Curated annotation (Swiss-Prot):
UniProt-recorded name of the protein: Co-chaperonin GroES
GO molecular function, one term: metal ion binding
Annotated InterPro entries: Chaperonin_GroES (IPR020818), Chaperonin_GroES_sf (IPR037124), Chaprnonin_Cpn10_CS (IPR018369), GroES-like_sf (IPR011032)
GO CC list: cytoplasm
Keywords of the record: Chaperone, Cytoplasm
Subunit note: Heptamer of 7 subunits arranged in a ring. Interacts with the chaperonin GroEL.
Predominant location: cytoplasm
């Protein structure tokens, strides 16, 4: 991947959603909702405050994060679908 996010932007790869329910029902791709979890692939340097101080992002590469269904902008890079979003659009980091 040759993307370097700017400012407080983060590049995320959606995690694959289960295609089968707990009861064994297979969900077709057309009916499945886009997952709202992903892995952080790249993080920008941060956002500057009004005084010009750079605030480092709270997320780091490798974090598993939760975000809204419509958060960010989907881009295709090297035939891979990625999401570019602001750090503010990330709701939580999933603790392991």
């Amino acid at each position: 991947m040759n993307l370097r996010p700017l400012h407080d932007r983060v590049i995320i790869k959606r995690l694959d959603q289960e295609s089968k329910t707990a009861s064994g029902i297979i969900i077709p791709d057309a009916a499945a909702e886009k997952p709202d979890q992903g892995e952080v692939l790249a993080v920008g340097p941060g956002k500057r405050d009004d005084g010009g101080k750079l605030n480092a992002p709270d997320v780091k590469v490798g974090d598993r994060v939760l975000f809204g269904k419509y958060a960010g902008q989907t881009v295709k890079v090297d035939s891979e679908e990625l999401i570019v979003m602001r750090e503010d659009d990330i709701m939580a980091v999933v603790q392991k």
